């Protein structure tokens, strides 16, 4: 599937839930989904009979859009999760959570996953002391993500840290704000992911 270049708020309305694609704005009364919580288009308010397949597809699309992953890569993640020990759905979410761009967002060094992805590509962060510029890199327990001294005055990073102070950091991560440093304390567990996701629908979709 190609990149989706339409307005982010339309994505939220299409999926029927907030995807938090605009970072802190999604927590304010400026959120477009709060004003129009129905699908975009002329028939957005119409009630339709939805098939099981459509429900499964929408759930998959929702998760893809939350993490900013294209179809081919998402399918690859599912295959990897299916081959690993444990529950496939939980494995899939753990893989997505361990992406470097997501971890940077969770640590509060970016206001959204998209912003985190852009910052990573520009080489703003280091991983275990080395420059990391691949957003899809998988972090491991003990990894240290840091903003080098030269990049600490970037306005978007300072603004994002103010947001994370209000929003909080997941228990599997540890952030030292004054030092602009984050540590992966453990692997993410299913209960660490608070966003409403029914991963079983995705497993059913790909198992057909």
Swiss-Prot record:
Matching SMART domains: Ribosomal_S4, S4
Keyword Transcription assigned to the entry: answer is no
List GO terms (cellular component aspect): small ribosomal subunit
> Tell me, which GO biological process terms does this entry list?
ribosomal small subunit biogenesis; translation
* Keyword NAD carried by entry: no
Residue span, S4 RNA-binding domain? 98-161
User: What keywords would UniProt list here?
Assistant: Ribonucleoprotein, Ribosomal protein, RNA-binding, rRNA-binding
Q: Which PROSITE patterns match?
A: RIBOSOMAL_S4, S4
GO terms assigned for molecular function: rRNA binding; structural constituent of ribosome
Q: Cross-referenced InterPro entries, in alphabetical order?
A: Ribosomal_uS4, Ribosomal_uS4_bac-type, Ribosomal_uS4_CS, Ribosomal_uS4_N, S4_RNA-bd, S4_RNA-bd_sf
Provide the assembly information. Answer: Part of the 30S ribosomal subunit. Contacts protein S5. The interaction surface between S4 and S5 is involved in control of translational fidelity.
The UniProt entry's sequence similarity note says: Belongs to the universal ribosomal protein uS4 family.
Q: What does this protein do?
A: One of the primary rRNA binding proteins, it binds directly to 16S rRNA where it nucleates assembly of the body of the 30S subunit. With S5 and S12 plays an important role in translational accuracy.
Q: What is this protein called?
A: Small ribosomal subunit protein uS4
The source organism is Nitratidesulfovibrio vulgaris (strain DSM 19637 / Miyazaki F)
As recorded in Swiss-Prot or TrEMBL, the protein's gene is named rpsD
